[in-house]
Amino acid sequence: MTQLEQLMRRNFLEYASYVVMDRAIPDIRDGLKPVQRRILNTLFEMDDGRFHKVANVIGETMKLHPHGDAAIRDALVVLANKRYFIERQGNFGNLLTGHPAAAPRYIECRLTPLARETLFNVPLTEYAPSYDGRKKEPVSLPSKLPVLLMQGPEGIAVGMATKTLPHNLTELLQAQIDLLNGKEVRVLPDFPQGGLMDPAEYDDGRGKIRVRAKIEPRGDKTAVVSELPYGVTTESLIASIENASQKGQIKIGEIHDYTTDTVEIEIQFPRGTYVEEAIPQLYAYTDAEVSVSSSIVAICGDRPEQLSVTQVLGFLTDQLLEQIRAELEWEKSQLEDKRHFLTLERIFVEERVYKRIEEAKTDKDVRAEVWDGMHAYEDRFARPMIKDDIDRLLQIKIRRISRFDIEKHKKDLEEIHRQIEEIVRKLADLKGTTIGWIEGVIEKFGGEWPRRTSMTSFTTVDKKEVARADIRLSYDPETGFYGSKVRGSRFEIEVSPYDKVLIVTQDGMYRIIAPPEKTLIPGKVLFCAKHDAEEGIGFTVVYRDADRVAWAKRVVIKTFIKDKEYSLIPGGPDDRARLEILTRRPDPGKVHLKFLPAKRQRVKEGTFDLNDLIVKGVTSRGNRLSPKPVSSVKLIRG
């Protein structure tokens, strides 16, 4: 058992680590999951400017991906529908309707100009062997964009999940400029479906947002949905509307879906229902309003971390500075190499060093003559000469030597020198250089992705307030049943599913219940009505206690525990204590009492004014009308 436990612990840890690191959670550096990175790298290697069959791209990616083609296909379609890095041709499905993409053999794709310009740089990319060792794949792409926040990846791993909401490219880049300038930033999500968003609880990517469909009235009887909430399709929205209609939460006449590249759902309402009351009901009971939580989890170094939007932007901005610096230094080193060789080439031709090899007998002698001949002009070198430089000089063809143009060569060197000085200047002002690069991307590509989601503040739609009071309740005194499926003649009321009903029975007991379909009420019902917990329901109560002494009180029933029985008679009813009068009249009038006969009794009856009573608690005894036992109680209307 111990060996099995150790085996399970080790294998589970390896499996969990693999799912987290190699499948479900994106890397903060390039914002990509491994399968996405392999797809983009494959497209980069295949890139010739033309479209490629998706089936072919999947096949090439399979050389790097240790899993099935379905995962590659699904990931490619998702990437393509983000529209940042993959240009589509053919039916890639519809994010608005939820329709799937066509088969891979029928659709084509290629890298977008944005991807070519910002994601790849082979000399600065770290590679690792693929799963079978036959090929190499990038450890991460040298992306210069905040891809993690742009795309909004989702993933479920062992013991954790990530759900990053997508943000607007231009706003992210502008936020990076603000960070470089030492300003505070606040970036909010932006969704391709558009819609309305209340970001009050976003909490920098650690909270949630509420999103709504954009619904506008068209006349008194029609509403049109023109934008969807994030994660909702036209099919799921229509299904939720139909479901709410079946439950009686909203009345719908007809629904017409005219969605193509833009959303257009026309909702028609029946007689008696108007747009002004129906739109809040749509937000309350359907997917026209949803809440979306955000949890940004990404691989940082060798482990997953939960981050905020500001933390991610800060990391990626620092990374961008380093990438710009690395690119400039690599470009500078390439120019210095070119300047060095052009200088050697000029000396080799202009000073006729090549003439020294005419008498050399062996390869060793040739190399020695070139080495010695070149070092005679060592003071003109851009940097020390190495043996590889000799090989390059010896590869210069005679035709090139004979056509050597000193003036052109001099201009080429001057241009290289100018470019190196420009790079040195950019490196000296790395922050300004980075800001300039970001501004260039915004100018070139920002217009392609304008903000689609409008930010606003929602007033929470209270389902109780917009619920339709279309449940008809009634009481059948012959059977004692009460509810919506009872055909009775007493206490007919119309309520909503969120209302509560107060029922008082002849024994002085009362209960507050939800609208039932059919329930048996023990005892004869004296009162039944919709109950408002804020206002309450007031009664004037007259009862006799166990000693048959009459008491009266005025009460207001407000607080309650649903379905719990309460008594208007302190101590509860018994064989002798009983409820005599229950009235809701604000001026209940007077009560006439007849006393039980007794020896030497002079007063046999009395009348008492109930209008003088003050409101007391439900459990209070009330006011004693007389200390004498009572034989009968009768209400006299004043």
Give the location of each predicted region.
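Catalytic phosphate-handling regions of large nucleic-acid enzymes and associated NTPases
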Residues: 1-206, 266
